[in-house]
Structure formats: structure tokens, C-alpha cells
UniProtKB/Swiss-Prot annotation:
This is Peptide methionine sulfoxide reductase A5. It comes from Arabidopsis thaliana (Mouse-ear cress). It is an enzyme of class 1 (oxidoreductase). Belongs to the MsrA Met sulfoxide reductase family. Catalyzes the reduction of methionine sulfoxide (MetSO) to methionine in proteins. Plays a protective role against oxidative stress by restoring activity to proteins that have been inactivated by methionine oxidation. MSRA family specifically reduces the MetSO S-enantiomer. Keywords: Oxidoreductase, Signal.
Length: 254
């Protein structure tokens, strides 16, 4: 017999329910840490001989935008932030003319800018005017921020192709040169992941700065939002359920 925790999409065997209850209680104690380092690697992958590239996109709320790129193979880290405006040091409640954006750090040996553009187009409605979904306002506009002439060429070509797909409506996506990308406040980083405290426990209750830079947290952020490609979503499901079945190992920090 299995009981589905629909909100979190995991299945806990009936025999582990008592354990799960005490585990939930332990979540209140920040000294408790549950790690799955043997299950999912969080190896640092950027180094001088393996440099990462970055790209910045705006496609609505940065909570969901960050999650949309998190599970893509070759994407190492993501950060929610603000770009495209003139205001210095924007904040969530006072961002001026900036757009909520996501900075994507990726390994160019695994994924290219063209593939990131494909994710961008497939993850939002580029024809919606003055907002995205239920979020209305200029801060939720669709925009590609380019870092080079080559990125500008690829972005422009992809926009033309997107427009040809539907001639009955106009693609509203802007393309502009990236100025300064301002990282958003900590509360907005890995937002989807933070809605699932037990996933935070699984990776060891990282401090905020570590969580923001974690490749593992980046993947789990996409997973928590159910935005991973089906194969990856299923793979992480099985890993998490395996840990649950075995009885999560609890390590207490001293």
C-alpha cells in the first residue's frame, strides 16, 4: 500500500509513515541535515580549463523562469534577477523599468545558445502583450538579452522563425543588448525548491549562498516545479523515493 503526497508527488510506503511524521517534526530543527550526495552529484564543474558561458532571458515571473532552465542538460546554475532597465540596484518592490529575468550558466560543450533559445520559446507565450499568464505588467515582458554579435544573430533568426509559425499574431519578444544583470534578493532564488522544505533537507540544509550556487539545487528547483523533461523528472522521482524507502539517513551538525 502506498500513500500519495500529491502536492510533492512522492510516494511513501505505509510502513514509513511514522518515520515520516518524526522527520517532518525534525524539519523545525535546523541542526538536522539529510543528504543524498551519493544519489545526485553536486560537483563543481566550472574551472579555468572548462569555462562556463552565461545567457540572460526574460519570460515572465522569474520564479518559474529560473525553474524552466534548471533541469536542462548542460545548464549548471541559474539565478533570478533584473535586467533591461535603467534603474541602479533594483529591488523586487522597486524594480523600475527592469524585467524579471533569469541568468543561465551553461557548459557550451554540452549545450549551445541555440538550444537555450529553444527552451526560451517553448517555456512562455511570446505573443502575450504586457505580461505573461496571470502576471500583468512591463516587468513580465518577453525579452532576450544578448552578449555578442553571434547571440544577436541567433536570437533574431529564432524570433523570425517563431513569427513564421503563427502569422495571425505578433511575437512581442524584445531583443536587446545586455547591460547589467542584477541578482534578485535571496527570497526569490530557487523559489520553487523552497516551497518543498523536505527537498532542502535532502541536500543538506545549505546556507543561502551555497543554495544559490548549487548545481544540484538548480536541478531540484526545476524538478519541484515539475518542469524537468519527463525522463529527468522520472529519474529524480525514483532517486527520491529510493531514499524514502530506505529510511532517510539523518546527520546532525555539531
Amino acid at each position: 500500500m502506498a500513500i500519495s503526497l500529491k502536492r510533492n508527488r512522492f510516494f511513501i510506503p505505509y510502513t514509513n509513515l511514522v518515520f515520516f511524521f518524526f522527520l517532518c517534526v525534525s524539519l523545525l530543527d535546523k541542526t538536522v541535515s539529510i543528504r543524498i550526495s551519493n544519489q545526485i552529484s553536486d560537483t563543481v564543474v566550472d574551472s579555468p580549463d572548462r569555462p562556463l558561458k552565461s545567457a540572460v532571458f526574460a519570460l515572465g515571473s522569474f520564479w518559474r523562469s529560473e525553474a524552466a532552465f534548471g533541469c536542462i542538460n548542460g545548464v549548471v546554475r541559474t539565478s533570478a534577477g533584473y535586467a533591461g532597465g535603467t534603474k541602479t540596484n533594483p529591488e523586487y518592490r522597486n524594480l523600475g523599468d527592469h524585467a524579471e529575468s533569469v541568468q543561465v550558466e551553461y557548459d557550451p560543450r554540452i549545450i549551445g545558445y541555440r538550444q537555450l533559445l529553444d527552451v526560451f520559446w517553448s517555456s512562455h507565450d511570446s505573443r502575450q502583450v504586457f505580461g505573461q499568464g496571470p502576471d500583468v505588467g512591463n516587468q513580465y515582458r518577453s525579452c532576450i538579452f544578448t552578449n555578442s554579435t553571434e547571440e544577436l544573430r541567433l536570437a533574431s533568426t529564432s524570433k523570425e522563425r517563431e513569427q513564421l509559425n503563427t502569422r495571425s499574431s505578433i511575437v512581442t519578444t524584445q531583443i536587446q543588448q545586455l547591460g547589467t544583470f542584477y541578482r534578485a534578493e535571496p527570497d526569490h532564488q530557487k523559489f520553487e525548491l523552497k516551497q518543498h522544505p523536505f527537498l532542502i533537507q535532502l541536500i543538506g540544509n545549505m546556507v543561502e549562498e551555497e543554495l544559490e550556487r548549487s548545481a544540484l539545487a538548480t536541478k531540484l528547483n526545476g524538478y519541484a516545479a515539475e518542469l524537468c523533461p519527463p525522463r529527468i523528472q522520472k529519474h529524480i522521482d525514483s532517486r527520491v523515493n529510493e531514499i524514502i524507502r530506505k529510511g532517510w539517513p539523518v546527520l546532525r551538525d555539531i
